[in-house]
């Protein structure tokens, strides 16, 4: 069985829980849809955990790209320092799109890692795109199954053409707000796709978003 993961954002503890649950449910191999290591929690530990699973395909996300090429900020400087040379070289080698079987993997759309494939946020909230909009964003892509991330929202859309698009949501950051391309909020909810949402133990929470300090 194949597990689809996306948007871990350096949250190693959430990643551990998701992988454990996946193994319990019979998952034996994974594909990852990007934005793996960016975030002020535990990027190096996340990288080490990722190397322990059977990862059969992976793509680079927009914030993976930011780690490699973005301007210096306190968070980026800390992430780069925590990761070191090997994870950065590994990250740089990831493709922007990939295929696995009859699935096409991308972070945002097949042509942009910063565009939401299934949601329009021009009004400040997530509106599910029309089929016409989705088809336009897919362009010449012919894969019968498209796996995407970026929005952090679990969603599955079946097109009248017979194609299926699945966003598994985010392992590490299930909801967030952003100001690009406009100010908007992304919220998680129960999807129609066969996905999983896990609740963290109450005894474990983050007390510092910059250092990832844990309070037990």
Spans of model-derived segments:
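Active-site-proximal beta-strand elements of phosphoester/diester hydrolases
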Residues: 1-9, 102-111, 165-169
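Core catalytic region of metal-dependent phosphoesterases/phosphodiesterases
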Residues: 3-92
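Active-site environment of divalent metal-dependent phosphoester hydrolases
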Residues: 9-14, 38-41, 64-69, 111-113, ...
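Glycine-rich, phosphate-binding/catalytic loops in enzymes
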Residues: 21-22, 47-50, 75, 122-123, ...
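His/acidic metal-ligating clusters that form di-metal
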Residues: 25-26, 85-156
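Generic structural signal for secondary-structure transition and capping sites
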Residues: 55-58, 96, 103, 213
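Structural motif
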Residues: 57, 104, 145, 163-165
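Acidic, His/Gly-rich catalytic cores of divalent-metal-dependent hydrolytic chemistry
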Residues: 158-216
């Amino acid at each position: 069985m194949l597990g689809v993961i996306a948007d871990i954002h350096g949250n190693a503890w959430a990643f551990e829980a998701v992988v454990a649950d996946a193994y319990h449910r019979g998952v034996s191999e994974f594909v990852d849809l990007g934005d793996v290591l960016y975030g002020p929690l535990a990027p190096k530990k996340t990288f080490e955990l990722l190397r322990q699973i059977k990862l059969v395909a992976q793509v680079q996300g927009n914030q993976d790209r930011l780690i490699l090429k973005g301007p210096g900020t306190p968070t980026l400087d800390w992430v780069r320092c925590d990761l070191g040379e090997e994870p950065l070289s590994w990250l740089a080698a990831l493709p922007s799109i990939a295929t696995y079987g009859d699935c096409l993997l991308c972070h945002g759309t097949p042509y942009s890692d910063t565009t939401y494939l299934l949601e329009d946020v021009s009004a400040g909230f997530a509106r599910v795109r029309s089929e016409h909009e989705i088809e336009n964003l897919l362009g010449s892509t012919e894969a019968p199954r498209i796996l995407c991330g970026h929005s952090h929202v679990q969603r599955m859309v079946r097109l009248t053409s017979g194609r299926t698009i699945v966003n598994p949501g985010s392992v590490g950051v299930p909801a967030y707000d952003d100001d690009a391309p406009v100010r908007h909020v992304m919220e998680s909810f129960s999807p129609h796709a066969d996905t999983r949402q896990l609740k963290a133990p109450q005894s474990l929470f983050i007390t510092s978003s910059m250092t990832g300090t844990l309070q037990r």
